[in-house]
């Protein structure tokens, strides 16, 4: 919106007529001083002055995109643990999540889908939480955490953490969960984000931004190179993200098949973070160490930016920097974070054959 303020004034200069005085000179001769000519009246107009007030655009904290509905900005982030077992596919909600973390679990992967700017009714299938979720998701400012099942040690740790427990055992009696009749247990537990948000505590707070974003006219860092795809070996799953220049997004495949959601839409994201971490163990479960530092590849706007990730506290967002030490800026939109083991990904450059590129 523009505000215009205009000041106009005419400056007029009054005419001045000066009459000469008759002065007697010596010798009796007198001269009359000629009258000075009247000064010309000049009208001057000051140019119009325009003042523009720019109203800042309100953006969603987890996407950097303009907020379509500002009334939802104060609600908390909602994390849903989504199953990736072959019998759980296709899933509901992966293309509606602002962020998705893919984690290694026992010989498979699982998704931590983070909703804030929009929801998904239904969402799922929903499976168990893991000890690694506590630190990995800790920067989202006490988010709601929807999950189902887990051993007593993990359950106790989650309930004592900064994650707000909305597990099946807590929220099912309040109408938070239901079984999908077209699927078999345990791959058929689903929920509605609308209902889960309604169960948020009164003091719930919105998430803080997790990344820095480029302006629309801002170029990607020069510390980048063109890319067409990345191939990633996760536990029990082969993942590929391929740049689609027509859609201006990265599209996902797993196990050499296009990964589509329940609406038959290809799973996609504007940014893909491939973050190398050390995985420890807790019993039989892997535990990603998400505090510290390591190598990162950030795929955005059709390029690869290589650099490092760093995090000193689990309640702080990850900091991603390129090889020059500058913070990597993301493209506004949805982001996937692949939490991988070291040396589990390859980049595929323009001119290379995607089909011939082998998974690491």
Give residue spans per PLM region.
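Juxtamembrane helix-loop transition sites at the ends of transmembrane segments
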Residues: 1-2, 134
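Bacterial N-terminal signal peptides that target proteins for export
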Residues: 3-13
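Hydrophobic helical h-region of N-terminal Sec-dependent signal peptides
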Residues: 15-20
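C-terminal motif of bacterial Sec signal peptides marking the signal peptidase cleavage site
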Residues: 22-25
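Bacterial signal peptide processing site
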Residues: 27-30
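A surface/extracellular/periplasmic glyco- and lipid-processing/surface-interacting theme
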Residues: 33-43, 47, 51-97, 101, ...
